[in-house]
Regions:
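Intrinsically disordered, low-complexity acidic/polar segments
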Residues: 85, 162-163, 536, 548-550
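Extracytoplasmic/periplasmic proteins that interact with beta-lactams or build/remodel peptidoglycan
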Residues: 1-257, 279-282
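Beta-lactam-recognizing serine transpeptidase/beta-lactamase-like catalytic domain environment
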Residues: 68, 215, 222-223, 264-310, ...
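Alpha-helix boundary/capping residues
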Residues: 96-97, 111, 130-131, 199, ...
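Short beta-strand scaffold segments in enzyme catalytic cores
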Residues: 259-262
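Conserved NTP-handling cores and scaffolds of large molecular machines
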Residues: 31, 97, 157, 443, ...
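Solvent-exposed, polar/charged alpha-helical surfaces in well-ordered, non-transmembrane soluble domains
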Residues: 87-91, 95, 125, 151, ...
Length: 568
């Protein structure tokens, strides 16, 4: 190779090395600058805040009314990028709000934020006078009003408590979570977490900044309360907020512990469903240790198990009529307190009494005899057909309580007590409502339904939870005959306090004895439907530690019916 050729190769080699070096330096600069831009972009995003307490869809009634009672409240919002003397101005803001300045400084380091507490008129006036740049009073959507409805059903939110739950949330859906996020812990908030959780704010405020995080002159503060989040949905229930409100007002005035369920007659749709004692969902934001609160606060009494007492006699009456074992004028004997194996509540006894009178007067000895005639197998068959072994509620996947076992009716020495709704017989208020609905609906059993579907922001249902087809569990003729007998309960029997002028009612009382209650106290039931002809509402009232179904629950049934008819 000639010397001149070697020289050219050497020059070419070093030019190539130099070029590669320049490329590497440029790539490093790009990477470094990219990091800076990424950081600035992050800062840019940090100049926006969500003007909603929780980025979640709503849980609504059948008409789209929020059950949580959400509302807008003024909150102090701070945009640090607009503060021209951040240290002094944050200290001045802390003095006005009577809060910790260091805490405000720490929040400001993270970007824009709002202070989630009520704003007094005097404080608002001071803020207006101070005219701090970057400090604004903005309406923030609060999820819970002063009187949220159906809290045991809607459930509550809580922060992700553990890495285990965080991993589960991340792996079971398409939504992204951070440790410390607020998520559904119970009820519909829990069951529909993935559908309710939003991915972006529907209501927000922000300051436009460029890629380097500098304020863009001109637009100033921007507020949008109509943004669209396509990934958050609303849970649409079958609840009627008007009926639910009536039920809860009556309960708050009269029921310390118990449940009320209202169903649209001839369907399985639940119009109202409430339990007491109750709570306000914001308690979980205010109490540091939830374990210190009584467990009973959070039990959904409407889906909990209780002995039904004489309400269970409806099952025996339906079975006996359907099987042709009795007619309305079949006679029974009642010896009162001397009757065995189960005494009658009427100490002197009903003596010789017809089946019609026995149901109207809720005669225990008559139904014990009827239970023995039917036998455990047939009682179990009809109780199951009428829904007393099904805890399913469409759209509300509560776990099954395995203590409910109708087979126990066939156990030794159980048949007599079971015939009057004691012993091993356990039911939920929702099941009792569905039982009475099967009579009101001409012998058709409808599965209870609480959720009708999921809707988007426009109110359009994007997913439906259809009602199940009804099942004919007794003949229409039997349902008509039994309905007439239940009407008689409110005309001449122990349920007369459920009757109201001008509207005929059908129903049944129940008084279940519970170990541990004071003398004379029982779980008091009244379950019925109204009007007797062409029913519209089926209602169950349970008052724990009441005086008796006819004395305690029946008058509350009447009050709820009266008020429901007024708002139609």
């Amino acid at each position: 190779m000639l010397p001149i050729q070697r020289h050219r190769l050497t020059i070419s080699f070093w030019l190539l090395v130099l070029s590669l070096g320049l490329v590497l330096v440029h790539l490093y600069q790009i990477q470094l600058q990219g990091y800076k831009y990424a950081r600035q972009a992050s800062q840019m995003g940090a100049q926006n805040i969500a003007l909603e307490q929780f980025t979640r869809g709503e849980i609504t009634d059948r008409q789209g009314v929020s059950l949580s009672g959400g509302y807008y409240a003024n909150r102090v919002a701070v945009f640090p990028v607009l503060l021209d003397n951040q240290e002094a101005q944050l200290r001045q803001l802390a003095d006005i709000l009577n809060t910790n300045a260091e805490q405000l400084r720490e929040q400001a380091r993270q970007g824009a934020f709002y202070i989630d507490r009520s704003l007094a008129d005097s404080t608002f006036a001071q803020l207006q006078k101070a005219k701090l740049p970057g400090v604004h009073v903005l309406p923030v959507y609060q999820r819970y009003g002063s009187k949220p409805l159906a809290v045991h059903i809607t459930g509550q939110l809580g922060k992700i408590p553990s890495r285990e739950q965080y991993d589960r949330l991340q792996s079971t859906g398409s939504k992204t979570y951070l440790l410390g996020d607020w998520v559904g812990r119970t009820g519909l908030e829990y069951f529909y977490e993935q559908q309710l959780k939003g991915t972006s704010a529907k209501r927000w405020a922000g300051v436009p900044v460029d890629a380097r995080g500098r304020v863009i002159q001109g637009p100033g503060l921007q507020v949008d309360s109509l943004a669209y989040d396509p990934w958050r949905l609303n849970v649409v229930t079958t609840i009627d907020a008007r009926v639910q409100s009536i039920v809860e007002e009556v309960m708050d005035q009269n029921i310390a512990a118990g449940a009320v369920v209202v169903m649209r007659a001839g369907t399985g749709d639940i119009l109202a469903m409430a339990g007491r004692p109750g709570y306000h969902p914001e308690i979980f934001q205010e109490v540091s240790n939830i374990d210190e609160l009584p467990d009973e606060l959070f039990i959904d009494q409407s889906t909990a198990l209780f002995q039904p007492g004489s309400v269970f006699k409806v099952v025996l009456a339906a079975a006996a009529l359907e099987e042709g074992l009795v007619n309305e004028d079949t006679y029974f004997d009642c010896a009162g307190s001397a009757a065995r194996p189960v005494r009658c509540w009427n100490n002197t006894g009903h003596n010789r009494i017809t089946f019609r009178q026995a149901l109207a007067e809720s005669c225990n000895p008559a139904f014990v005899e009827l239970g023995l005639r039917l036998g455990a197998e047939r009682i179990i068959k009809y109780a199951a057909a009428m829904g007393l072994d099904r805890q399913q509620i469409i759209g509300y996947p509560v776990s099954t309580d395995t203590r409910q076992d109708l087979a126990l009716i066939a156990g030794p020495y159980s048949l007599a007590n079971s015939s009057v709704g004691q012993g091993p017989v356990l039911v939920t208020p929702v099941q009792v409502t569905a039982l009475l609905n099967s009579i009101a609906a001409g012998g058709n059993y409808y599965t209870p339904r609480l959720v009708s579907g999921l809707s988007d922001d426009s109110g359009r249902l994007v997913e439906l939870y259809d009602a199940n087809e009804p099942e004919q569990v007794i003949s229409p003729a039997t349902a008509d005959r039994l309905g007439a007998l239940l009407h008689e309960v409110t005309v001449s029997g122990v349920g007369q306090k459920a009757a109201l002028p001008g509207v005929e009612v059908a129903g049944k009382t129940g008084s279940a004895q519970v170990t541990g209650y004071a003398d004379g106290k029982v779980d008091a039931w009244f379950a019925g439907y109204v009007p007797y002809e062409n029913p519209r509402y089926v209602i169950t009232v349970l008052v724990r530690e009441g005086a008796g179904g006819g004395e305690t629950a029946a008058p509350l049934f009447r009050e709820i019916v009266t008020r429901c008819l007024e708002v139609e």
